[in-house]
C-alpha cells in the first residue's frame, strides 16, 4: 500500500510529534515536531528534518552541528498522530551534547542525571 501523507493526523498547528530512536540499539534519542513538509523532506532526502516551533523554520538535524540523523525507517502509530523515526545518529542527539535528550531520570522522587555529555 502506498503511503499517503494526508492520512496522518496533525494537530491544530499542523504538527505531529516525532520520536527519534536509534535503529540498532532501540535507545530513544529525542522528540521533536514535524509538519507535512518536514515529513516529505525527510522521506525525499533521507536526512531527518523537523519543524522548529521556536524559530518557525525547518530544522535539518545536524545541519549546523554535524550530528546528522539518517532515516532508516519511519513508523506510524495506530492513531496516525505520532511518528517513530528509526534512525542512524552521528554523535549526540541532544543540544546538551548528550547521546539522548532523555538524560534525567526520576528515581524515588528525585531527579537524577543518568547520561553525561559526550566528549
From Swiss-Prot:
It comes from the Bacteria. It catalyses: 1-(5-phospho-beta-D-ribosyl)-5'-AMP + H2O = 1-(5-phospho-beta-D-ribosyl)-5-[(5-phospho-beta-D-ribosylamino)methylideneamino]imidazole-4-carboxamide. It is found in: Cytoplasm. Binds 1 Mg(2+) ion per subunit. Mg(2+) binds at residues 77, 79, 81. Pfam families: PRA-CH. InterPro entries: PRA-CH (IPR026660), PRib_AMP_CycHydrolase_dom (IPR002496), PRib_AMP_CycHydrolase_sf (IPR038019). Coiled coil: none annotated. It is an enzyme of class 3 (hydrolase). One of its GO terms (biological process) is L-histidine biosynthetic process. One of its GO terms (molecular function) is phosphoribosyl-AMP cyclohydrolase activity. One of its GO terms (cellular component) is cytoplasm. Its cofactor is Mg(2+); Zn(2+). Zn(2+) binds at residues 78, 94, 101. Catalyzes the hydrolysis of the adenine ring of phosphoribosyl-AMP. Homodimer. PANTHER family: HISTIDINE BIOSYNTHESIS BIFUNCTIONAL PROTEIN, HISTIDINE BIOSYNTHESIS BIFUNCTIONAL PROTEIN HIS7. This is Phosphoribosyl-AMP cyclohydrolase. It comes from Cereibacter sphaeroides (strain KD131 / KCTC 12085). The lineage of its organism: Bacteria, Pseudomonadati, Pseudomonadota, Alphaproteobacteria, Rhodobacterales.
Amino acid at each position: 500500500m502506498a503511503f499517503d501523507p494526508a492520512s496522518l493526523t496533525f494537530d491544530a498547528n499542523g504538527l505531529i510529534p516525532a520520536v527519534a530512536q536509534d535503529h540498532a540499539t532501540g535507545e530513544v534519542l529525542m522528540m521533536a515536531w514535524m509538519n507535512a513538509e518536514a515529513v516529505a523532506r525527510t522521506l525525499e532526502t533521507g536526512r531527518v528534518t523537523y519543524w522548529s516551533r521556536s524559530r518557525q523554520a525547518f530544522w535539518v538535524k545536524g545541519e549546523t552541528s554535524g550530528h546528522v540523523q539518517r532515516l532508516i525507517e519511519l513508523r506510524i502509530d495506530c492513531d496516525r498522530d505520532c511518528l517513530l523515526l528509526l534512525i542512524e545518529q552521528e554523535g549526540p542527539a541532544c543540544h546538551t551534547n548528550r547521546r539522548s535528550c532523555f538524560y534525567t531520570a526520576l528515581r524515588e522522587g528525585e531527579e537524577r542525571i543518568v547520561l553525561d555529555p559526550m566528549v
